[in-house]
């Protein structure tokens, strides 16, 4: 029987910082993302505006892709496509091939996208717009905004719960959590 060890995100980031070496490059791990049902680890390099896929043991970079500005968030759909949002240059959403880590398309996604989530029930992408104080529902096939919902002040993060039927939106300024319900 294999034992599973849970490492807090803070400890994992410290582990990566201590073991990560790349000649003559500034690397500043900022965010961690899991994909492929927890089998793939991605790390953002804020200084280099990169998304890096790490080896399963976390010791080596397998692949990396560069963007026009730092990556704020990442999600993966049921088909394995990755999508990331970057807030520079008036906000961009990139669609990536999950295996090759190559950019398939990019679109403007609001001025300040701070988080992105794929919802399997609505088959939509949900993007928080930090300084617009909104949650956007985007159709992945057409890449068009379907719905805009006001959600308090500076939404920075979200999490699905109740079997993906609800979203909890975390706001940055004063304690104002909001809940947005997904249409089924």
Model-identified regions with their sequence ranges:
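Sec-dependent N-terminal signal peptides
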Residues: 5-14
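Predominantly soluble domains enriched in secretory-pathway, periplasmic, or organellar proteins
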Residues: 14-184
């Amino acid at each position: 029987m294999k034992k599973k060890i849970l490492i807090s995100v803070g400890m994992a980031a410290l582990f990566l910082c201590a073991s990560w070496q790349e000649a003559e490059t500034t690397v500043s791990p900022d965010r961690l993302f899991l994909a492929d049902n927890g089998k793939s680890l991605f790390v953002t390099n804020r200084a280099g505006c990169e998304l890096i896929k790490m080896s399963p043991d976390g010791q080596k970079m397998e692949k990396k892709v560069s963007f026009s500005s730092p990556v704020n968030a990442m999600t993966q759909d049921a088909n394995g496509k990755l999508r990331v949002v970057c807030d520079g240059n008036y906000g961009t959403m990139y669609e990536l091939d999950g295996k090759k880590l190559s950019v398939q398309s990019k679109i403007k996604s609001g001025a300040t996208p701070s988080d992105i989530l794929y919802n399997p029930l609505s088959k939509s992408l949900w993007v928080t717009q930090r300084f617009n104080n909104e949650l956007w529902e985007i159709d992945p096939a057409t890449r068009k905004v379907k719905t805009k919902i006001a959600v308090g002040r500076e939404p920075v993060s979200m999490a699905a719960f109740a079997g993906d039927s609800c979203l909890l939106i975390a706001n940055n300024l004063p304690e104002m959590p909001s809940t947005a319900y997904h249409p089924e």
